[in-house]
């Protein structure tokens, strides 16, 4: 058991409900199993593991609109109902829950679980929670994948000022990763897709330039061809062995994703990002994935939750 992790909560099977169409197991709720025992993960049977990071402490610290703590369970609820077009089976490992602003402790415990799963040959598909999940997720991967790059689909760079010893928030995860890489004398490989000019201050663009961040603006995705965009991604991933892929739902337009802390009036459409996401999965270099910033209390008719689940389902079905 993960008994020594105070903020770990086992999976809730009640979230995984759906329509029974046929005797065949054709929906996600019929392909899910539940594990909370470390020994069950020490097996040759490699799995895709769903793990939630139920936190909006980082959003609160970043002066955003809270509610994302409820995101992981809502994504699982919506994913459960969807048809599954592959023969894989999945594991819900539960959530790490941030209580009483214990963000650093929660991030550390989430990282421990991610590390343990990957060390035993499994892959993680994680659900946030605020984008503070990115620093937690990266910590769990970094020692296992030396030539690791980070690709973030996001309206924001999330490179707000951060110094070691300070408290991080949902706007600092990639600054924290950059600081970590500097300390470890490792290269900082970071690419951000969907950046909004008016979602980032000039100093953040300067910071991105200083750190040699590769990025495409939302405008680039509107104006440039898909072939041009894929060539850009190819250039970034060429010398990387592995990729940690993270999706912040505020990269999408408010009409598609109203249920986020910082909705974007000029955001992207789902079909502008899906081909790029699928291309990255098909590269074979993505070792871990998460989707962040769903805030159910801010959502409208479950639009954002259903879209988050659909994005995950599409990527799980991509080979």
UniProtKB/Swiss-Prot annotation:
Pathway: Amino-acid degradation; L-histidine degradation into L-glutamate; L-glutamate from N-formimidoyl-L-glutamate (hydrolase route): step 1/1. Pfam families: Arginase (PF00491). Catalyzes the conversion of N-formimidoyl-L-glutamate to L-glutamate and formamide. This is Formimidoylglutamase. Belongs to the arginase family. Mn(2+) 1 binds at residues 131, 154, 158, 248. InterPro entries: HutG, Ureohydrolase, Ureohydrolase_dom_sf. Its EC number is 3.5.3.8. Keywords: Histidine metabolism, Hydrolase, Manganese, Metal-binding. Binds 2 manganese ions per subunit. GO terms for biological process: L-histidine catabolic process to glutamate and formamide; L-histidine catabolic process to glutamate and formate; putrescine biosynthetic process from arginine, via agmatine.
